Protein backbone atom coordinates (compact mmCIF):
# COMPACT_ATOMS: atom_id res chain seq x y z
CA UNK A 1 0.00 0.00 0.00
CA UNK A 2 2.80 2.42 0.95
CA UNK A 3 4.55 1.71 -2.36
CA UNK A 4 1.35 2.50 -4.27
CA UNK A 5 0.96 5.85 -2.48
CA UNK A 6 4.56 6.84 -3.33
CA UNK A 7 4.04 5.97 -6.99
CA UNK A 8 0.81 8.00 -7.08
CA UNK A 9 2.59 11.04 -5.61
CA UNK A 10 5.39 10.68 -8.18
CA UNK A 11 2.84 10.48 -11.01
CA UNK A 12 1.07 13.59 -9.69
CA UNK A 13 4.33 15.56 -9.65
CA UNK A 14 5.19 14.47 -13.21
CA UNK A 15 1.74 15.48 -14.46
CA UNK A 16 1.99 18.84 -12.70
CA UNK A 17 5.36 19.53 -14.35
CA UNK A 18 4.04 18.55 -17.77
CA UNK A 19 0.97 20.79 -17.41
CA UNK A 20 3.09 23.76 -16.28
CA UNK A 21 5.37 23.27 -19.30
CA UNK A 22 2.40 23.18 -21.68
CA UNK A 23 0.94 26.33 -20.09
CA UNK A 24 4.23 28.21 -20.50
CA UNK A 25 4.51 27.13 -24.15
CA UNK A 26 0.93 28.27 -24.85
CA UNK A 27 1.58 31.65 -23.18
CA UNK A 28 4.78 32.13 -25.20
CA UNK A 29 2.95 31.21 -28.39
CA UNK A 30 0.23 33.80 -27.70
CA UNK A 31 2.91 36.40 -27.00
CA UNK A 32 4.69 35.61 -30.28
CA UNK A 33 1.46 36.04 -32.22
CA UNK A 34 1.02 39.59 -30.91
CA UNK A 35 2.20 42.15 -33.51
CA UNK A 36 5.19 44.24 -32.41
CA UNK A 37 5.51 47.87 -33.46
CA UNK A 38 9.04 48.93 -34.37
CA UNK A 39 10.30 51.90 -32.30
CA UNK A 40 10.54 55.33 -33.94
CA UNK A 41 14.31 55.35 -33.58
CA UNK A 42 15.04 52.61 -36.07
CA UNK A 43 17.24 52.32 -39.14
CA UNK A 44 16.01 50.28 -42.05
CA UNK A 45 17.50 48.66 -45.12
CA UNK A 46 15.70 48.81 -48.45
CA UNK A 47 16.85 47.22 -51.71
CA UNK A 48 15.21 48.02 -55.06
CA UNK A 49 15.73 45.52 -57.88
CA UNK A 50 16.30 46.64 -61.45
CA UNK A 51 13.06 44.95 -62.57
CA UNK A 52 10.66 42.16 -61.66
CA UNK A 53 12.35 39.62 -63.94
CA UNK A 54 13.43 36.39 -62.25
CA UNK A 55 17.07 37.19 -62.97
CA UNK A 56 16.93 40.69 -61.44
CA UNK A 57 14.98 39.49 -58.40
CA UNK A 58 17.46 36.68 -57.84
CA UNK A 59 20.33 39.19 -58.05
CA UNK A 60 18.57 41.39 -55.50
CA UNK A 61 18.29 38.43 -53.10
CA UNK A 62 21.99 37.57 -53.43
CA UNK A 63 22.99 41.17 -52.73
CA UNK A 64 20.50 41.30 -49.86
CA UNK A 65 22.05 38.25 -48.21
CA UNK A 66 25.63 39.50 -48.61
CA UNK A 67 24.92 43.04 -47.40
CA UNK A 68 22.67 42.01 -44.51
CA UNK A 69 25.23 39.48 -43.27
CA UNK A 70 27.89 42.18 -42.91
CA UNK A 71 25.64 44.90 -41.50
CA UNK A 72 24.30 42.52 -38.85
CA UNK A 73 27.82 41.98 -37.51
CA UNK A 74 28.43 45.75 -37.44
CA UNK A 75 25.32 46.68 -35.42
CA UNK A 76 24.73 43.60 -33.23
CA UNK A 77 26.48 45.10 -30.17
CA UNK A 78 25.37 48.71 -30.70
CA UNK A 79 22.95 50.10 -28.11
CA UNK A 80 22.32 53.70 -29.25
CA UNK A 81 20.82 55.14 -32.42
CA UNK A 82 23.61 57.75 -32.60
CA UNK A 83 26.32 55.10 -32.70
CA UNK A 84 24.33 53.10 -35.26
CA UNK A 85 24.11 56.18 -37.53
CA UNK A 86 27.83 56.82 -37.22
CA UNK A 87 28.79 53.23 -38.03
CA UNK A 88 26.40 52.94 -40.97
CA UNK A 89 27.51 56.24 -42.52
CA UNK A 90 31.14 55.17 -42.26
CA UNK A 91 30.33 51.82 -43.90
CA UNK A 92 28.43 53.11 -46.97
CA UNK A 93 31.41 52.71 -49.34
CA UNK A 94 31.94 49.17 -48.01
CA UNK A 95 28.25 48.34 -48.51
CA UNK A 96 28.48 49.48 -52.13
CA UNK A 97 31.65 47.42 -52.61
CA UNK A 98 29.90 44.31 -51.23
CA UNK A 99 26.95 44.84 -53.58
CA UNK A 100 29.28 45.37 -56.55
CA UNK A 101 31.36 42.28 -55.75
CA UNK A 102 28.21 40.15 -55.44
CA UNK A 103 26.88 41.50 -58.73
CA UNK A 104 30.13 40.65 -60.51
CA UNK A 105 30.00 37.10 -59.12
CA UNK A 106 26.51 36.76 -60.61
CA UNK A 107 27.76 38.00 -63.98
CA UNK A 108 25.47 41.04 -63.97
CA UNK A 109 26.27 44.58 -65.04
CA UNK A 110 23.97 47.17 -63.46
CA UNK A 111 24.50 50.53 -61.81
CA UNK A 112 24.49 50.54 -57.99
CA UNK A 113 23.64 53.47 -55.74
CA UNK A 114 23.78 53.40 -51.94
CA UNK A 115 22.17 56.22 -49.92
CA UNK A 116 21.47 56.81 -46.23
CA UNK A 117 18.57 59.21 -45.76
CA UNK A 118 14.89 59.56 -44.87
CA UNK A 119 13.02 57.10 -47.10
CA UNK A 120 9.23 56.78 -47.51
CA UNK A 121 7.76 53.43 -46.43
CA UNK A 122 4.13 52.20 -46.65
CA UNK A 123 2.39 50.43 -43.76
CA UNK A 124 3.27 46.77 -43.90
CA UNK A 125 2.87 43.63 -41.79
CA UNK A 126 6.13 41.71 -41.96
CA UNK A 127 6.09 38.40 -40.08
CA UNK A 128 4.66 39.47 -36.71
CA UNK A 129 6.05 43.01 -37.00
CA UNK A 130 3.86 46.02 -37.81
CA UNK A 131 5.57 48.79 -39.78
CA UNK A 132 3.52 52.04 -39.78
CA UNK A 133 3.72 54.19 -42.91
CA UNK A 134 6.08 57.16 -42.85
CA UNK A 135 9.56 58.39 -43.57
CA UNK A 136 12.32 56.47 -41.81
CA UNK A 137 16.08 56.56 -41.72
CA UNK A 138 17.23 53.89 -44.10
CA UNK A 139 20.00 52.60 -46.28
CA UNK A 140 18.58 52.54 -49.80
CA UNK A 141 20.34 50.30 -52.32
CA UNK A 142 19.10 50.83 -55.87
CA UNK A 143 20.08 48.32 -58.54
CA UNK A 144 19.89 49.50 -62.16
CA UNK A 145 16.61 51.34 -62.81
CA UNK A 146 15.16 50.35 -59.42
CA UNK A 147 11.80 49.48 -61.01
CA UNK A 148 11.46 46.01 -59.46
CA UNK A 149 9.87 44.77 -56.26
CA UNK A 150 11.80 45.78 -53.17
CA UNK A 151 12.95 43.97 -50.05
CA UNK A 152 13.45 45.71 -46.73
CA UNK A 153 13.93 45.13 -43.01
CA UNK A 154 14.98 46.91 -39.81
CA UNK A 155 18.74 47.03 -39.26
CA UNK A 156 18.70 48.82 -35.92
CA UNK A 157 17.49 47.49 -33.57
CA UNK A 158 18.68 44.35 -35.42
CA UNK A 159 15.34 42.85 -36.53
CA UNK A 160 16.13 41.74 -40.08
CA UNK A 161 14.52 38.48 -41.17
CA UNK A 162 15.63 36.75 -44.36
CA UNK A 163 12.60 35.09 -45.99
CA UNK A 164 10.77 35.47 -42.67
CA UNK A 165 13.28 33.29 -40.83
CA UNK A 166 16.76 33.44 -39.35
CA UNK A 167 18.99 31.42 -37.00
CA UNK A 168 17.08 32.54 -33.93
CA UNK A 169 13.68 31.67 -35.39
CA UNK A 170 14.91 28.19 -36.34
CA UNK A 171 16.33 27.70 -32.85
CA UNK A 172 13.01 28.67 -31.25
CA UNK A 173 11.19 26.16 -33.44
CA UNK A 174 13.68 23.46 -32.47
CA UNK A 175 13.20 24.34 -28.78
CA UNK A 176 9.42 24.05 -29.18
CA UNK A 177 9.73 20.64 -30.85
CA UNK A 178 12.13 19.47 -28.14
CA UNK A 179 9.72 20.70 -25.45
CA UNK A 180 6.83 18.88 -27.14
CA UNK A 181 8.82 15.63 -27.34
CA UNK A 182 9.84 15.98 -23.70
CA UNK A 183 6.21 16.47 -22.66
CA UNK A 184 5.13 13.43 -24.68
CA UNK A 185 7.87 11.35 -23.05
CA UNK A 186 6.75 12.45 -19.58
CA UNK A 187 3.15 11.48 -20.36
CA UNK A 188 4.32 8.09 -21.66
CA UNK A 189 6.33 7.54 -18.46
CA UNK A 190 3.34 8.57 -16.35
CA UNK A 191 1.05 6.16 -18.22
CA UNK A 192 3.55 3.30 -17.88
CA UNK A 193 4.03 3.93 -14.15
CA UNK A 194 0.28 4.16 -13.60
CA UNK A 195 -0.26 0.82 -15.34
CA UNK A 196 2.57 -0.71 -13.33
CA UNK A 197 1.13 0.62 -10.06
CA UNK A 198 -2.32 -0.73 -10.94
CA UNK A 199 -0.84 -4.12 -11.80
CA UNK A 200 1.11 -4.28 -8.52
CA UNK A 201 -1.97 -3.23 -6.58
CA UNK A 202 -4.00 -6.01 -8.21
CA UNK A 203 -1.22 -8.48 -7.42
CA UNK A 204 -1.24 -7.34 -3.76
CA UNK A 205 -5.01 -7.86 -3.65
CA UNK A 206 -4.64 -11.32 -5.18
CA UNK A 207 -1.90 -12.17 -2.67
CA UNK A 208 -4.13 -10.96 0.16
CA UNK A 209 -7.03 -13.06 -1.11
CA UNK A 210 -4.80 -16.15 -1.31
CA UNK A 211 -3.63 -15.59 2.29
CA UNK A 212 -7.23 -15.24 3.47
CA UNK A 213 -8.26 -18.47 1.71
CA UNK A 214 -5.22 -20.23 3.22
CA UNK A 215 -6.20 -19.07 6.75
CA UNK A 216 -9.82 -20.13 6.26
CA UNK A 217 -8.74 -23.59 5.09
CA UNK A 218 -6.20 -23.91 7.96
CA UNK A 219 -8.79 -22.96 10.59
CA UNK A 220 -11.33 -25.32 9.04
CA UNK A 221 -8.79 -28.17 9.22
CA UNK A 222 -8.16 -27.44 12.90
CA UNK A 223 -11.81 -27.84 13.82
CA UNK A 224 -12.62 -30.70 11.45
UniProtKB/Swiss-Prot annotation:
UniProt xrefs under Pfam families: Spore_II_R
Protein name: Stage II sporulation protein R
InterPro entries: Spore_II_R
Biological process per Gene Ontology, one example term: sporulation resulting in formation of a cellular spore
NCBIfam families assigned to the protein according to its UniProt record, in alphabetical order: spore_II_R
Organism this protein belongs to: Bacillus subtilis (strain 168)
Keywords of this entry: Sporulation
